[in-house]
């Protein structure tokens, strides 16, 4: 589950091996707010001309359980006499709503379709300021200039913190869109390499 945590990462810098002029114009700071310690999404090959990032089953397990757990409690609350109070109904609604909200934001898909020549992100994420990204997130694949890998340290009150990594798309106009944000460095680098090969674009890796 994505948790909104304090970002304690030092200011990132452009990798020394990158000489592309656009690299000096883009931001090298984390793009999204929070993150997860485990693998939140993975790159899936849908066909010869399409790949997409999907949330992992483990990542959506908890919100799904919250949503499903709320249903029988809501039903019991509706059927119970008013004299017994509305506590169960409120509890069920709360569990259902929290699960539904988390599930909505955690079932993001980032689709790269060579046949249509379009990249589409089906959900908006929270940016580094805690606000929703602008919509719609649909751009031409030809506008993608490079892939950017960043690291950040996340910490919450009473937590020792953990490392989280971002994979972002970089566009010709110096804009960025996040497509992966989790704590498994090896797997996010593997996904970045596979996506770079699919798109024929370079990877700008600022993770040290």
Sequence positions of predicted segments:
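Short, charged cytosolic
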Residues: 2-48
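Non-transmembrane, membrane-adjacent beta-strand/coil modules in membrane-associated proteins
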Residues: 6, 33-35, 120-187, 206-207
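Short, ordered beta-strand-loop transition motifs
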Residues: 38-54, 113, 155-161
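Conserved beta-hairpin
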Residues: 43-44, 53, 99-143
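Alpha-helical transmembrane spans
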Residues: 48-111, 177
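Short, structured motif recognition centered on aromatic/hydrophobic residues
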Residues: 51-53, 69-72, 110-112, 119, ...
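Cytosol-/stroma-facing membrane-proximal "stalk/adaptor" domains immediately downstream
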Residues: 184-208
